[in-house]
Amino acid sequence: MSNEFTHINADGNAHMVDVTEKAVTEREARAEAYIEMAADTLEMIMSGSHHKGDVFATARIAGIQAAKKTSDLIPLCHPLMLTKVEVELEAQPEFNRVRITSLCKLSGKTGVEMEALTAASVAALTIYDMCKAVQKDMVISQTRLLEKRGGKSGHFKV
């Protein structure tokens, strides 16, 4: 693990990292998030009886869109040409929650960790938004990077 913040320059100011001289490599990142809810709320999602429509389909599209917009949301992120974004949603009724996983890929000069984290986070927020009329105390938690490949820092896996 590095002991330097790459987004802080010598004067202590935030700046966008210069990746001009970095090599183009295959990069991939996976992230996850969970949203916990009442059993009745989860059943409504699973059965497709939610009055707003298919919650999982909407959350999946929102996560994909969010990955593509990460540089608009996080000030020092580079705009990236993503080659793949995948968002999966898994109902876990035994825990009254939904597990969201994301995968982002590209060939580029900088990693896709923030895009994967943003995809999982926004998918969870979309579930909250669609279900808040029936339950306001849902909890989004455990958002984390699961794995990253490529680039100078190499492979990371939890």
Curated annotation (Swiss-Prot):
Pfam family, one: MoaC
Protein known as: Cyclic pyranopterin monophosphate synthase
SUPFAM superfamilies documented for this protein: Molybdenum cofactor biosynthesis protein C, MoaC
Reaction(s) the record says it catalyses: (8S)-3',8-cyclo-7,8-dihydroguanosine 5'-triphosphate = cyclic pyranopterin phosphate + diphosphate
Source species taxonomy: Bacteria, Pseudomonadati, Pseudomonadota, Gammaproteobacteria, Alteromonadales
Pathway membership: Cofactor biosynthesis; molybdopterin biosynthesis
InterPro entries, per the entry: MoaC (IPR023045), MoaC_bact/euk (IPR047594), MoaC_sf (IPR036522), MoCo_biosynth_MoaA/MoaC (IPR050105), Mopterin_CF_biosynth-C_dom (IPR002820)
EC class: lyase
Gene name, Swiss-Prot/TrEMBL: moaC
Keywords: Lyase, Molybdenum cofactor biosynthesis
Molecular function in Gene Ontology: cyclic pyranopterin monophosphate synthase activity; GTP 3',8'-cyclase activity
Functional description taken from the UniProt entry: Catalyzes the conversion of (8S)-3',8-cyclo-7,8-dihydroguanosine 5'-triphosphate to cyclic pyranopterin monophosphate (cPMP).
Keyword Oxidoreductase: no
Record-listed substrate binding positions: 76-78, 114-115
Organism: Shewanella sediminis (strain HAW-EB3)
